[in-house]
Amino acid sequence: MTLTTAEWASFRALIDEPVDHKELECQAYLIHAAGLLLPGDPSSIVAATEERNFFGRTDFIIAADILDDTNQNSRHAYIFELKAPQCHLFETVTANRCQPTRDFIAAENQLLHYYDEAVGNARFRQRMNIVDQDNIHIGGVIIGTLGRLLRGGGNLPAARTALRVREKYFYPNRKLRVLTWDRISDYVRP
């Protein structure tokens, strides 16, 4: 699924919007990034947005048939929490340490709750055509841009360290990924 140059320019304009939050408008472009968001060589790709659950609304779910190492297809779903490209990931605490912004922490928290709900929900598995609950995965958080990594600029190496530490200690077990909207934009650029 390839974007035209005009479609990509419209997407990029949403990301570059300086003030208004454009999360919902950007959401529609994520299906074009399936190759980035899903592992392997996915087929029969479908997406669901704003999927209602006990805790709220799951922003983005992408499901696909994925070929495994024994050459068998099985259906998998990946759950993503979105925050606007206009959100920052980190803010400065001290000269050498950053902490996640309220938006970033909220995204992680929502993602964990939505994932936990989906794994235990037989109706969700039925709607997504998932047989095994182990085939429901945390996809990740899509938030901000590289330019909005750190609120107010400043010590960018400290912000990168803060993200690296989270990726090293918090995320590996469930393979949670943190992507920026400009990463998505670069991937879908025609």
Regions found by a protein language model. Give the residues of each.
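Charged, terminal alpha-helix-loop-beta segments
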Residues: 1-190
